[in-house]
């Protein structure tokens, strides 16, 4: 989520994720997203009649339980037809994929290396 003290690296990842949304043909890309279920995702876009949300994460974010809790909140709060795209640095893609598998999030989250 976009916070008051966004790091330069997180800002770069958030903007890269918004650009990726555009290159995938999604429309009405916004960053930050509109609030949804008491959360403010980093990016939002339209894909036909559905909304796609995006979260930018850094490699070090996966060493904290806060990230798991935040993703659990997204998966539990967003309607099942909504998709969450997780933008991460390519360098940590295998590690993050393992974490998502262990946490049971692979069915609701699309991982994108940026």
Across the structure, where does each feature detected by a protein language model lie?
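Hydrophobic beta-strand segments of well-ordered beta-sheets in folded domains
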Residues: 50-53, 80-87, 109
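Short, well-ordered coil/turn elements that cap or connect secondary structure elements
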Residues: 26, 79-81, 105-106
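Domain-level recognition of nuclease-like catalytic cores that cleave nucleotide substrates
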Residues: 90-114
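Acidic-basic catalytic patches of nuclease active cores, encompassing PD-(D/E)XK
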Residues: 1-36
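Short, charged, amphipathic alpha-helix that recurs within catalytic cores of restriction-modification
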Residues: 64-89, 93-99
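Structural motif
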Residues: 33, 55-60, 87-90
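Conserved catalytic cores of phosphodiester-cleaving nucleases, focusing on short active-site segments
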Residues: 17, 43-74
